[in-house]
Amino acid sequence: MSAQPTLCVRPADGYTARVPRYPLGYRRGTTQAQEENMYKILDRVDYSDDVYVQVIEAPAIAVACQPGQFIILRIDEEGERIPLTIADFDREAGTITIVVQAVGKTTRQLQRLGRGDSLANFIGPLGIPSEIEKVGTVICAGGGIGVAPIYPIARALKDVGNKVISIVAARNQNLLLWEDRMAEISDELIVTTDDGSRGRHCLVTEPLKELCEAGGIDLVYAIGPGVMMKFCAKTTQPYGVKTLVSLNSIMVDGTGMCGACRCSVGGQTKFVCVDGPEFDGHQVDFDQLLARQRQYLPQEKESLDAYLVNVGVTKVA
């Protein structure tokens, strides 16, 4: 008889997290034949050598999904668990869309899967959903693959009557993601590239500062690499504009029990998985966050190198 997941988990510092008795995606009483048909990849699109999109069949998760939440997946029974923000969801079709950048062993292993392949575990929706309400004029700034998780948030903000100004940023035009999708749900779209190959030749913070200086901005969402979110928050702080960021941290269980995703917000310890992933960008200790993200780089490189040798790849494109 399978043991039930814990209802209440308590990390070392006394934080208490309430989690569902059976999180969506937790397998109970399924046969091998049933499991082989679960979490099937229905579609796959490659945007570059390293960035790809997968549409996963997960009806129980899709029906409960809200903007800002994430999933944790595992490719096979021996694989690691990785968190990925939900880029889109279709409740009627029962699908979840994820956008992935292949940077380590697991994301490159996932990159080799295509239509018809299945995942061993796909758990969610996790995290606190975005607070979607009409506030006025909202800037949604997405950097790199951060455009994907900001898309459902921007869409929801537009649906409730906000004016949405979107900034889509990337290092170059080949790395721009979902520019067309963001244009469809935005009142104004600004495109920037670091090398000037498309849109404005500048960093995302330049138009962000200009918009804040002009006034009338009620809320800013910034999602992307940690450094990008750090400087977006620094840019908006002098203008007193509320700025929300979605943190991507090391994570194992997704219930607050392991403590791997802890971060400092306003001088207090928070857990990205149960307290976030969204936080006040002006309160986040980004230096600590970035340092924690780098702490396992040697081990990650060792794991990736071993995997590439195993699959016959000697050099990452």
Each predicted region: which residue ranges?
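Ferredoxin-reductase
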Residues: 34-117
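FNR/FR-type flavoprotein reductase catalytic core
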Residues: 105-252
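Local cysteine-cluster metal-coordination motifs and their immediate loop/turn environment
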Residues: 149, 226, 249-278
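Short Fe-S-cluster ligation motifs
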Residues: 271-275, 279-317
